[in-house]
A protein has these predicted regions:
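Transmembrane helical core of 7TM receptor-like proteins
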Residues: 1-319
Length: 319
């Protein structure tokens, strides 16, 4: 069979023979993969259209060339990258029943998936800082968040995300995979590949956990801290109407923070405490955490942000 053939390749791994992995998609539901491809294709399509529309509106409307919308552009680009990193193998497995992936391609994919995941967290932290400056230091908003500063923040977010993920595929290349070569998902994830290793993979496992704590954990703490300071500043405003107006500028960001971090926490909890759960639950949680933000983020900003909503309506000639 295809699986046994690939397992032999892995067992006989040498310097001249690259391991090949099998992407299982939804184990036990292979007979409905073609049907499952429909909602996933729709989700990808919505993500591409939504984020591309937000980017187009921000880039073409000069009135939106402000720090808040520049950071929103970064978020939309990150969401597009996250979608593109999983799309090729997801469609190959569900639509074409092509499940084989070479180790080098798998390592490249997991590099991009995890890079864009950490980049999303970094951009959300930068957006929280933007809201903090706008509400707590409104008179200095444009002098603090200049175009130069925003560019440097964006570059720092990208370099940080790439830097912490880069050792992951490099470490994986040194491990020998002697177990069955089937991966649990329709794409490659670090922990999933790590399970196949029969050599000491503790260093890579500990490093992966450390990176998650140092990025997602630290970012979430600073985002929470920024909103504590924002709330303190808002409560100091005398006018109730002005309080609501100030908080309203943060609602969209708070929504996308929850859309990102709640599934991440859910995946972590299921992975750690849900050993008895069906593998399908684990797979669905991973799919949700990678697909939900790219699909919902542009919807949230289109509904909650008047300038974006009006820009979209104008672009399509509705008003």
């Amino acid at each position: 069979s295809c699986l046994s053939r690939v397992t032999m390749v892995v067992w006989n791994n040498s310097d001249t023979m690259e391991p090949i992995f099998i992407l299982r998609g939804f184990p036990g539901l292979e007979y409905v993969h073609s049907h499952l491809s429909i909602p996933f294709c729709l989700a990808y399509l919505l993500a591409f259209i939504g984020n591309a529309t937000v980017l187009s509106v921000i880039w073409t409307e000069s009135s939106l060339h402000q720090p808040m919308y520049y950071f929103l552009s970064m978020l939309a680009l990150t969401d597009l990258g996250m979608s593109l990193s999983t799309l090729p193998t997801m469609l190959a497995v569900l639509c074409l029943d092509v499940r084989e992936i070479q180790a080098s391609a798998c390592y490249a994919q997991l590099f991009f998936i995890h890079t864009f995941t950490f980049l999303e967290s970094s951009v959300l932290l930068a957006m929280a800082f933007d809201r903090f400056v706008a509400i707590c230091h409104p008179l200095h908003y444009t002098t603090i968040l200049t175009n130069s500063v925003i560019g440097k923040v964006g570059l720092a977010c990208l370099l940080r995300s790439m830097g912490v993920v880069l050792p992951t595929p490099l470490l994986l290349r040194h491990y020998h995979c002697c177990h069955a070569s089937a991966l649990s998902h329709a794409f490659c994830l670090h922990q999933d590949v790590l399970k196949l290793s029969c050599s000491g993979a503790r260093i890579s496992s500990v490093y992966g956990l450390s990176v998650v704590i140092a990025t997602l954990g630290v970012d979430s703490v600073f985002i929470l801290l920024s909103y504590v300071l924002i709330l303190k500043a808002v409560l100091g405003i005398a006018s109730h109407e002005e309080q609501l107006k100030a908080l309203n500028t943060c609602v969209s960001h708070m929504c996308v923070v929850l859309i990102f971090f709640v599934p991440v926490i859910g995946v972590s909890m299921v992975h750690r405490f849900g050993k008895h759960l069906s593998p399908i639950i684990h797979i669905l949680m991973a799919d949700i955490y990678l697909l939900l933000p790219p699909v919902l983020n542009p919807v949230v900003y289109s509904i909650r942000t008047k300038q974006i909503r009006l820009g979209i309506l104008c672009k399509f000639g509705i008003r």
